[in-house]
């Protein structure tokens, strides 16, 4: 069997090494059977149920049209649920619901039954309502399949760390397949996962186009029990579905459901990492299929940077009610005690400090702050506005406070320019509703917002974020006002409060256990882990740590080839250039960022061997 290695250089900064076995005869069904606790017959049943679902939804929406013809035509086109997430692989598409969900047989049957009925009553029921689908014991065990490369592993661990830091959910990496329930990360044909715990081996596919923290957090969110945000029964109060622009055979992927989904009292969040993008399943990948009721939210939906505050709150409400019970909640602006560390507040985006009382600390820039407003205008601008402008990977936030009884007025002035994408990646965000926990309006591209914004309460938050590019940025002026607020959709207030945990004894950790076996035999991209147990009721710190291992360079493989790809943005605009070169693997190989030095894999980054995994 021939092998190939792929080495990608992204934005001249990140390198990814991918080695796989090529086998043209490989059946897509084998991917599901290998990584999920499913047999051939079950897989066929799920495929049949999904097809019935598609046909039924198609007949109701497009009476008189032939489903078979539409399905054939649609299969020729690329589809995705968000421009920030990879396209859906056509080979796995027949087995997936809503683009990236592999349903259990029971879930598929329940959804088809609900679709077959004429339901007129909608219950306020984004979380799986089946209580058996929650993970009963922690930590959740997981392992990496050999198809996962070194860089992807690091991104998966970073995503897991984000979940662990923000919730009471804990994970444990294991080298071999354990007995019982566990997650197996593998490099499959696209990005997909199951909803909730399904028993035994449960895969999460992180394909080549999925190696982004927000996408990985999204797929882990499915495994914990999160459905897509726009599937909630209350979704049509916030978005409308434009059927004329949806690929007809995919209309079943736009259902709002009540029986399978429980909102847990969490407000609808247009900035959820679980939300479809505006061109999901679009006929031409440009026409909008999901349109926000408030047009100012249009470029907010579909983000895949990270979990939103309410994404995390949903899981904390479902799993962590017993945490932090004895702690007095002193967090401001809707923050609450962090379940993973009850002495800290978990703050809404844009806020920070011990009690969420101040703006969030800046990232890679000197900016942000707290502004006490008066009737006089004050100005705020992005870093280095307007020239040379902001740089990639910066963040700033400003907490704006008007006198009691007044509101905050915001106007954009002078030049305005950001990287232009259908879902804003670089943006300025205004949080001006009476719920500062929810995501606000995000603005990008080149057209300066011309209207004057007025907050609903005496406080507002402005957030600047750049992920990919450099550009001019924004400048605004702010002041206090007695004007009426700009009308917008009022988010529902959370009805389920976080139950604040008793820590009766100080941290008492046991000694670290033995290191696990290395996941690779050579090349420096292997990892090993070890765990320790908490001997007191509550411990702070990591219960598992990771290290690199087997740093000897891999032997020469004459059948191996490298694909070098260089992708970069130019001048901060939408401009991408791809350069490809082929070369043979004629020397012992190391996984990036390691290089072969006298037969050993060493990093060109100082202390990289020792610190990479321990710092994740």
Curated annotation (Swiss-Prot):
Residues 316-357 form the EGF-like domain. GO terms for molecular function: metalloendopeptidase activity; zinc ion binding. The active site is at 219. The keyword Methyltransferase does not apply. It comes from the Eukaryota. Disulfide bonds join 168-320, 191-210, 324-345, 347-356, 367-396, 424-444, 518-549, 522-554, 534-539. It holds the Pfam family TSP_1. GO terms for cellular component: extracellular region. InterPro entries: Astacin-like_dom, CUB_dom, MetalloPept_cat_dom_sf, Metallopeptidase_nem, Peptidase_M12A, Peptidase_Metallo, Sperma_CUB_dom_sf, TSP1_rpt. SMART domains: CUB, TSP1, ZnMc. Its cofactor is Zn(2+). Residues 506-555 form the TSP type-1 domain. Residues 1-21 form the signal peptide. It is an enzyme of class 3 (hydrolase). Binds 1 zinc ion per subunit. Glycans are attached at residue 173. GO terms for biological process: molting cycle, collagen and cuticulin-based cuticle; proteolysis. Residues 22-125 form a propeptide. Mtalloprotease. Involved in molting, a process during larval stages in which a new cuticle is formed and the old cuticle is shed. This is Zinc metalloproteinase nas-36. It comes from Caenorhabditis briggsae.
């Amino acid at each position: 069997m021939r092998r190939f290695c792929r080495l990608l250089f992204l934005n001249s900064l990140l390198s990814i090494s991918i080695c796989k076995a090529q086998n043209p005869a490989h059946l897509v069904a084998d991917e599901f059977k290998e990584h999920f606790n499913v047999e051939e017959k079950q897989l066929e049943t799920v495929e049949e149920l999904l097809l019935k679902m598609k046909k039924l939804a198609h007949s109701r929406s497009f009476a008189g049209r032939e489903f078979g013809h539409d399905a054939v035509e649609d299969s020729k086109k690329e589809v995705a649920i968000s421009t920030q997430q990879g396209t859906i692989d056509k080979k796995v598409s027949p087995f997936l619901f809503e683009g990236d969900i592999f349903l259990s047989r029971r879930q598929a049957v329940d959804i088809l039954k609900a679709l077959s009925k004429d339901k007129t009553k909608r219950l306020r029921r984004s979380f799986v309502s089946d209580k058996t689908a929650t993970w009963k014991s922690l930590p959740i065990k997981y392992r990496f399949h050999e198809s996962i490369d070194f860089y992807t592993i690091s991104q998966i661990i970073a995503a897991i760390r984000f979940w662990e830091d923000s919730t009471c959910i804990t994970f444990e990496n294991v080298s071999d397949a354990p007995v019982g329930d566990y997650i197996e990360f593998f490099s499959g044909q696209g990005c997909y996962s199951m909803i909730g715990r399904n028993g035994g081996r449960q895969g999460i596919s992180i394909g080549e186009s999925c190696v982004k923290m927000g996408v990985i957090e999204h797929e882990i969110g499915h495994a914990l029990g999160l459905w897509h945000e726009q599937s909630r029964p209350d979704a049509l109060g916030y978005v409308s579905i434009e059927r004329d622009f949806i690929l007809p055979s995919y209309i079943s992927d736009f259902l709002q459901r009540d029986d399978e989904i429980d909102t847990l009292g969490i407000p609808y969040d247009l900035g959820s990492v679980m939300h479809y993008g505006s061109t999901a399943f679009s006929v031409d990948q440009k026409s909008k299929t999901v349109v926000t009721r408030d047009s100012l939210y249009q470029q907010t939906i579909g983000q895949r940077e990270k979990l939103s505050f309410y994404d995390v709150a949903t899981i904390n409400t479902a799993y962590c009610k017993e945490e932090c019970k004895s702690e007095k909640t002193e967090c401001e602006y809707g923050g609450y005690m962090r379940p993973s560390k009850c002495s800290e507040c978990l703050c809404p985006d844009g806020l920070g400090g011990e009690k969420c009382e101040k703006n969030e600390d800046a990232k890679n820039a000197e900016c942000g702050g707290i502004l006490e407003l008066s009737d006089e205008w004050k100005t705020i601008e992005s870093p280095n506005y307007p020239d040379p402008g902001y740089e990639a990977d910066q963040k700033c936030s400003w907490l704006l406070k008007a006198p009691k009884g007044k509101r905050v007025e915001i106007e954009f002035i002078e030049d305005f320019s950001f990287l232009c994408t259908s879902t804003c990646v670089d943006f300025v965000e205004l949080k001006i509703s009476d719920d500062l926990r929810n995501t606000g309006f995000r603005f990008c591209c080149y057209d300066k917002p011309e209207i004057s914004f007025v907050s609903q309460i005496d406080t507002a938050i402005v957030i600047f974020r750049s992920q990919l590019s450099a550009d001019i940025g924004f400048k605004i002026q702010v002041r206090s006002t007695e004007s009426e607020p700009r009308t917008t959709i009022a988010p529902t207030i959370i009805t389920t409060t976080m139950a604040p945990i008793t820590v009766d004894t100080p941290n008492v950790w046991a000694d670290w256990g033995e290191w696990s076996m290395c996941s690779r035999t050579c090349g420096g991209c292997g990892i090993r882990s070890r765990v320790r147990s908490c001997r007191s009721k509550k411990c702070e710190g990591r219960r598992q740590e990771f290290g690199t291992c087997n740093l000897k360079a891999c032997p020469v493989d004459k059948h191996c080839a490298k694909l070098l790809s260089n992708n970069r943005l130019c001048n901060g605009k939408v401009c991408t250039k791809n350069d490809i070169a082929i070369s043979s693997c004629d020397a012992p190989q190391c996984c990036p960022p390691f290089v072969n030095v006298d037969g050993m894999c060493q990093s060109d980054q100082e202390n990289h061997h020792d610190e990479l995994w321990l710092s994740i």
